[in-house]
């Protein structure tokens, strides 16, 4: 790479030594002092050194990279060498924007004060945002304080008309809101018609921010086109904010721009929240100061409870309901009526404007812990550093770069709609979730007439949106019962109030850096998804209850009846799911609401193991148990199903995903406790039970995932899939014959065959079991057959697995965790940025000491420690070592987790594994453009000992194709230089290696099927319109020995009757004073590239042209207006070659007959393949013209000769001095005289 690129990479990775080395030549003449003349060596180093303000493709300078990645020392070093702080990237971001976005207060101070270049604090990006916007949005209060001290203008609005105060209020940055209000209280009155800080805070439920704004003097009744802040809070279900606004004295009769009051809004969105808000408005209008229907303060216990008083059971509330206004009564009735109907998630979303959806992303505190009949609490399973957790007040939460996973939510608009049963599951698919359902004992819910429609509405919502919704809260119809859902999400910070603000809707400014950071965060997470929280149907009944327990920790399932723990009117139903000893998820399933309620004897456990729907794939949850507890006969106290595996039936697989196989850890404890009424049917869903068996080999466990996945999770090592035969067998056996989701449990006379371990399982009887009905008998026979088939296949595979050679495996961990374990966490960026981003592919056969040195780890002691730790990592096993032979390139790349390169391999002709086994590293660099050394080493290690052709030898220096002489003899190739002149010892010839690889790819029989050609040419080739070629062409390797290619690109008639058109960038032309063949093209390419790289303005001026190649020559066509600019006849083209430094750049030399000068024209193609095809097509055009000349002369029809081959005296061009890769030397004789087609060639090109 060039020095500019080295400087950018060093600044990004934090390599201070390399930055100092690259910029050291400037010292002394720029800032080093001294008034004497500069030494010549210093002048030369300045000339050759990198540009300190050079940019990459995204417009980032080295200072951008250093500021974004927090490299303080490099920022100081760059400023010392006069790096400019006021250069914007392609999106208009200045370095101070990135430092403020990152929250690095030290770098912000350096950029402002250090100099010699000082940042201007009010600079705006393309979105009109200042650095204060970035800091305020992400809650970086220290940076905000610095910027306010530097007199940053807080009244500047971005393209969405948002001030920094608006952003801080929108995202709940309480501390920032207080700071800005304190510094500029006049902002309270600077509002637009679209929004105010109060509206934005109310919309997202930031209660504390709303209170601060009101205390600071903001008008509570200020209005926008959306109405008052009460409209916003009511629309999004923010009950706490509604209460605060009402207590402050807001006018509830204000109308929005559409003439709607708050009550009208609630009518349009019937939900549990709407019911609560309507009741609150009722009390407010009646003069009640404090609500009795909202939740009580959070208990000190870890479980947050919601208390809702029942208006029916409370005499005082009965009195109030009788005196309610007619409008409110009508509203409440309409809400209840609408809830009985099928209201889907889409119906609710369609009424919300796009502006709201763009700004909402995270679950607010009402959704997480304070409102509704259930609460959700978020806790962290990953220890975050202190810098990643910002200690804020009630509504504060960390966002921005320290929590990059938050920015990955696929939808920022649907997370927080304020409706009680809907919250989008929008976390990345590689995250773990642990759901815990704990119904509380002392919660009062709404009256009995509300019981059924709440559950029906919840089931309808789940059914209509299974793929993107997570049922976060299920309202409980029981008067003495309610549920609570606890969500554990890795990667989230643990706050006191468990609330999270919405994720900002702007992506990180740096695409390259953000991608690397995101990969670093996501990569270590297991590949699994979450399921959907099932609905819990608790019916309000005053009957005795019995409690049953399912214990699966020892491989058995038992139901034990026990006396009720409390009187029937206040008895507690607790459903609890816990995971002990494992990090896997117990997913929660839902019961299909199309199942008709049926009654069965209690001995027939009505449970069925279903596959999760394709919309909520849950690879880690093997079983979903749907339980329906029936009326129990008197005197029946215990149902025991110990050591009897639960039956399961596989749902038809509706997706095409290939099943995987994993093992899970042993000793997984799942415990489910539920209560049972003695004389009333109740529906429960038993959630997250994982069946485990004792006695399996090596303590491993095979689990069938019901969504079409057989998975195997192990404590050590990588996940590998089972043979395809086993998977095919599993798929073929996955059938479902019953339309019902209920199935009877097998009787005690039937031996269960669901035995996943080698030891047999004892049969246990079930008291009171009745005979199975005939309809279930046939189903169980089918299930027994399925279990037998799967059991045989799994046991056979276990034997094969146990027969393999065992070896140490490393725990699945990130590169950062691995470096932390060896005490060198500072090198994480070095490894990640250079492709060493997966511990599973960093064994001793992948990483070497030289690699560590190249990526900037200069400390020899640290390198030695890393190399010692690498010895403990597993070596990469080459393909074929353990019987694994990938059948396709895509499969092989996926196996080494480099699937992103699949397209690059295929479009460059590497379409089979046989071709890959002969690939060289230089091809990975120059052809495939794989710049990360870690990825290259991983690829080569995976390929193992590859089959190369014979050691490449350098080709002859030049081959001259001459025109026929006067005696009409065929042209002769010039004598080749002796091969003994070039030895293969010491180094390989890189150009020839690449040409060999290209020849291998083009020998592939299907290669030409993939070659992009013109539409007309493809049609004519398919229909045979070309017919047999009228002339016979010599293959390229016979026409010139400088290329080993054996096939031309096009049909000869294509170049005779039509032309081959290619689009490219024209970099310019250079006068050739001394014609030296490919050396001249090489010099011209280097000069033209250097001119274009000097400035971005120069690059913007590079025109796009179309090269139209035929046997007559090359036409320059303006790609914009399709005008012909100039023509170069084939006889005047001397040499065509690719640039060895950049294979996408090529050039050819032509002679201007008017001035008798030679010019080299330089182009850049869109990719390497296109450049090579253009060069080869030029060679084919000459061959076609030459063969036509031969045919004409043999037939004596001199008049039909192409004008390029009329008999004229000729003299050969001197041989080029060096060889060049993939070049076609079209060295012709020069002719005197001027043809009409050449009269304005060079003049037109120079003007162009």
Swiss-Prot record:
Keywords: ANK repeat, Cell projection, Cytoplasm, Nucleus, Phosphoprotein, Repeat, Synapse. GO terms for cellular component: Cajal body; centrosome; cytosol; dendritic spine; nucleoplasm; plasma membrane; postsynaptic density. A motif (Nuclear localization signal) lies at residues 935-938. Residues 810-876, 884-949 form the SAM domain. One of its GO terms (molecular function) is ephrin receptor binding. It is found in: Cytoplasm. Residues 305-322, 371-384, 753-763 have a biased composition (Polar residues). Residues 1056-1213 form the PID domain. Residues 558-575, 969-984 have a biased composition (Low complexity). SMART domains: ANK (SM00248), PTB (SM00462), SAM (SM00454). It comes from the Eukaryota. One of its GO terms (biological process) is ephrin receptor signaling pathway. ANK repeats lie at residues 2-31, 58-87, 91-120, 127-156, 160-189, 193-222, 225-254. Residues 577-601, 1236-1248 have a biased composition (Basic and acidic residues). The modification Phosphotyrosine is found at residues 901, 1007. Isoform 2 may participate in the regulation of nucleoplasmic coilin protein interactions in neuronal and transformed cells. Isoform 3 can regulate global protein synthesis by altering nucleolar numbers. PANTHER family: ANKYRIN REPEAT AND STERILE ALPHA MOTIF DOMAIN-CONTAINING PROTEIN 1, ANKYRIN REPEAT AND STERILE ALPHA MOTIF DOMAIN-CONTAINING PROTEIN 1B. This is Ankyrin repeat and sterile alpha motif domain-containing protein 1B. The gene is ANKS1B.
